[in-house]
Amino acid sequence: MASQDRGSDRTSRRLTKKRKDGKKPMRDVSLDMPERFKDGDDAHEDVTAPKGNHTMSMNQSIFSMIARAGQQSNTDLGTMQEVDSGDSDDEGTRNVPYHILDGAARLSRLSTANDFQKTSGQTRDGKTEKGKHRRALSENKLLRSLPKLKIASRKDARSDGQGADQMSSSQFLPPRPSPEGSMPAPASSPPPPAAKGRVRPGDGIQMEKGRNVARKTRQRSPAAAATGEAPVSLAKRIQHIFEFAQEEEVISEYPCWLLQSILLQGYMYITQKHICFYAYIPKKHHDVSKTGYLSKRGRSKHNRYWFILRGDVLAYYTNPAELYFPRNRINLQYAISAEVLEPKRKGDEETSFVVTTDERTYQFKADSVASAREWVKSIQKVIFRTHNEGNSVKISLPIQNVLEIEESSILDFAETAKVRVIDNDETFAIDEYFFSFFTKGQDALNVLRIMINDNEHHQAAQKPVEPPSRALGQSDSGFMASTNAPSEVPHITENVRATLSPLTAPHVGRSSMSDISVRSSVDANRKNRDVRRSMDAGRTLRRWSLEGRRLSHEAHRSPSPSGHDKTHKGRVGDRSPKSPRATDSDSATFSLDPGTESSAAIQSMDDSTASASQILDRSDLFRAPVVSSPNAFSNGVNMSAHSQDTTRSSAPRPAYSKGTHPTTSPSIDPLSPGAPDGEYDTDAGGATRLSGSSSALQDIASYPLQKASGLAGFLRTRSKKMGNLLAAESMGYYEKVSGMLAGGRKHYNTAEGLETDDQVNVYEDDEDAAKATDNFREHFAFREDEVLQSSFFASLQRVLPNYGKIYISGRYFCFRSLMPTSKTKIILPMKDIENVNKEKGFRLGYYGLAIVIRGHEELFFEFGKAEYRDECAITVLRILENTKYLEDDQSSSSGVDSNDEAAKAEHDLLQQAREDNNVDKTKNLSEIVRAAADDRIPLIFDDPLASFVDFKPPEPLTIVCLTIGSRGDVQPYIALCKELLKEGHKPRIATHAEFEPWVRKHGIDFAPVDGNPAELMRICVEHGMFTYNFMKEANSKFRGWLDDVCSSSWRACQGADVLIESPSTMAGIHIAEALEIPYFRAFTMPWTRTRAYPHAFSVLEKKMGGGYNSITYITFDTIFWTAISGQINKWRRRELGLQNTSQSKMQASLRPFLYNFSPHVVPPPLDWPDWVRVTGYWFLDEADTYEPPADLVAFMDKARKDGKKLVYVGFGSIVIDDPAALTKTVVDSVLKADVRCVLSKGWSDRLETKDASKPEIPLPSEIFQIQSAPHDWLFKQMDAAVHHGGSGTTGASLRAGIPTIIKPFFGDQYFFAQRVEDMGVGVWLKKVNTSVFSRALWEVTNSQRMIVKARVLGQKIRKDNGTQVAIQTIYRELDRARSLVKKHAKLDGELSEEFEEDWTMVEDGEEIDVPHPFEVQQPVAGISQDASKMGGGSLVLGSMVLKGAQKRSPESAYRG
């Protein structure tokens, strides 16, 4: 149908090629074209075609010959499947299957690699209410090492969600009535657990994580209660946020920066007993932080990809236009560091950088040093956010723990205080914190020193101490320091509490994971405390210390040292049987198996008890065993076991103390420290996991299996499925391979909205569901709140079927190829899917399913059975029913984490308390350097001279923008210059004199450039832009015109510091060389060589492939330079005083280039270098000052009242042969399409040929003619736009989000017409006649698919800020532009020292004889001739070639 875009038509034809009935499949988006829009007699006419000589435009002349030899385009999605021999992304190369590790086990491996001493735990209250999605408590990657709390099984939880979302209608199942009062819940929400384990109120403040928890907390908190009442004091607010036992007077507060791998802006609060730091950093999981091209190191070479850093995922793509097809995704949640590599040679600057995760290291290469640093900084920000607990940074340093305050000179531009503090009362590890002050630094240092020196607790701590002999319940006064501690340390009655790890003191050896050592505990009676209690208000459970491999339990988060730590009683049904510890606890080795589902899984084993599977899989067993004393576990220490697996059976299972037989102990403390705290999964290679469905198996698993552990390592129970014991390794492999080959589907939870009778499938048990969900997240680098709902085996149909697996979650439709040579992945957001349609398969016996995607061609999948295809369609449609009406700004893609609500409220309350206390609000440097995008971590600590404040030059610059052409060529520069004025620079626009009033109206300096744009437009329309006929006429008639343009441009650019030129001006690059200033290019159409798009002046109606596209740039540049080189070189010698130049010497391809169109309209090609930047449109908004005529407003109101669509028609100031015929065609088409038209009749007769006796065509009441109106105001009122396709006009109509019809006339208009049609947001009008034009008008005003695509594209373009991106690019690339400035040799001066320059630069009239070969070789052999004379021989050869070339005419050069 005409209503479908070209890509959709192509796919539809493929899908229906083998249909026997010959009919096209039904599409909800298809249009029934009315009969009146059939082609009429004028269907082949074109009223805009030139009369008389039918000249061929460039895209029909020489490039037609090139096209015949060009390679056919291969831009199909199949290009994503090529085997990359140089890529190192093969998941099979990993040493340990990463997907089998739970969150804390991954963190354990992370700590092993980096010694990131992050010991504070975190938890999430996963309770879901009213269908809102919340991460389940057990799914948190940092909780699985914690004591177990009972969590309701997913089956029980699922019962609450059934029937909540009734699918009202479906093409597969009959509708069912919705229960009264039931509201549909979003499909992305997992089933709410029936009864979540809840921590006692005294165990911590439930505040930070989880929106529902935050709401309840604020409702019962004093802060929330005081929102509408009297202001709460700052001291009270700090007590609440930092969880002090009592309110403490705030001595002072200072804005400061925490210095770690980054500079983090926040506030320091000094109270009576604490030094506190607070900073708010929302985790933005959906914001795109940075995009660009990088080269990724593979096995044998570097491969260039398009990278997108979104949230905490770094994804890279082979094709930037196919963002649904990532090459791979790197999850930065488990990243450790990012850093630029050291240069191999001193003095060089390295453009490579590495990103280290807990399992591998990725190496990337940027195009420039600045780009590499920016990528590293952006990734470091993400790593910092993911390593910090919660959405705010909180640090509480007890003053009695502080050893000293020192002034540091680590930063040159700020005063920095180094605080050395004892971390905890067990290891007495010393940490260092650096706080930088841009203002009041000395005041802060003085106050800190006074507080430390005069504090009574600190003074008391300076007295000699004795070895500790404190009992468990001993009071503070009797608490002594450890014997392992320094000889003189303060009383440690409270630990440092922080949500992130500090900088470790260089002279203090912190225990490392790589050592697998247990931190010694010298006091057998002292309770095992958390090393650092997190103050993240939502995390009430604390994970055990990873660095020490010791157990810790959840304690009251109050710093009171005398209170007993409260334990949590185990909930029934949460623990599975585990392999008990060895009887000899003195030789117990605490090992963290990578196959365990709980990272806190502890197994005691020696060499005799290690199973074969464990020996094969565990590298830690080859290390020296760590012996732990039994005293390390005090009798007073209780351990509560918290399972991360929510799918365990609810059958009660006791936990046993070490050395106790399971059948002889009548009363076992479930919190005994001897109880193992994890379960082993043989899928990962070695431990045993037993299902709880059989009491006999429970007894077997509970009995000590020291002598049978080798056999137990290979066995597991699958009683629910098979009832027999099978070999885990071999069976797991067999199940995977046989399941993949057999195909099928699996569902992991009950489909919401379906009654029991509607369930057409068998659901997997909860154990397999959890494992499948973990694998799903691992494959696609999703966050832990993404829950897998269903999976299907199917083939992605392309040129050849690509067999793989479909994964469906609440928010994504994903596909992963299972073919050995393919790495194809698809990540398709559900919100981008319009519909799913059942189709016939391409192959006999297969059943097809077409996924209709918004703004993209359909994806076609083939299933082995019809029922599998139908179930997949049902699953997708059910999710679409719940998500189709969600707006982007209301969904989770708004950029701010939904869990940030509580932290944001906490931050706002603290800000209010600070204002209420009349804090000094003087603006300081820390606020000035805040990032433009409201980034809460604006700066990365780096070279302060190179990276401070976005590379902005210290002095204002005179920036000249040089361009020629029409109004559309000048308008973008006005928008750019207005922003440059705001930056403090002095911009100037050099263009035609007729635009001077318009430019000066905006306060911009102006310089005139000669040349009549109307004459230029005439030959462009008549001959085509830069065709051979165009060049011929321009060469014969416009030699004087070109001389005038060059000379006037030279005068207009005097005094410039930076030159920005449109390449069509032809003179700017030479002027910049003469002035020795940085030179930038900027244009509205592709001008840089690429295989992705043809040259904007060489667009054909049919795509010809990358070979044709690339050669169009070479051919155009060659023809263009050949035509003007003689005249340009004469002008260079005459006025600029420069020698002759050539294409290679100009180095145009190395110059920084700014493209002022949107990357959503023209995605940056893969082969463009980093200094070529697509910035976005430079819009000049004038709607605020425009007052529309009353009759125009009345016309539009009447059209809306009549229910008619409004269409804008205007072709600018195009000159055509017969304007009356065009006007008549527009009138007839508008009437035939039954729309209302706002007409801007700018077209006119060709110059000096207007016939005054020719009457104007009368306009009917359905058409309202205007002279002019700002596009940014007018297009918002329209339903569609028809215009000539200029870059600025196209950008304005697309930004308004309306379908666009383009009738191109010359130049880049053909390029943008093709882009609009390719994107499916408009129509490329090849001819203008009533039949074609009226049909196009009806289509753009009635095709819902096109309307929706245009609206979505408009939303994306409106989010761009092209002028700001352009300015930042200018700042960033200024050094590169300066590096390309060369000292030129004047004609009357000595030859340049540059060897390359000496070869070709000679005078025209200079006659030099060619020497014989021996005359050159002899001095070389004897090294007796001067080097300059040696170059003379080469100089003569070069002069002869150049001299011969100059004698040829441009036409003969072209013919040759």
From Swiss-Prot:
UniProt-annotated stretches for the region Disordered: 1-229, 500-612, 631-691
Primary localization class, coarse: cytoplasm
EC number: 2.4.1.-, 2.4.1.173
Domain GRAM: 236-283, 774-840
Ranges where the PH domain occurs: 287-384
Biological function: Sterol glycosyltransferase responsible for the glycosylation of ergosterol to form ergosterol-glucoside.
Protein name in the entry: Sterol 3-beta-glucosyltransferase
Organism: Leptosphaeria maculans (Blackleg fungus)
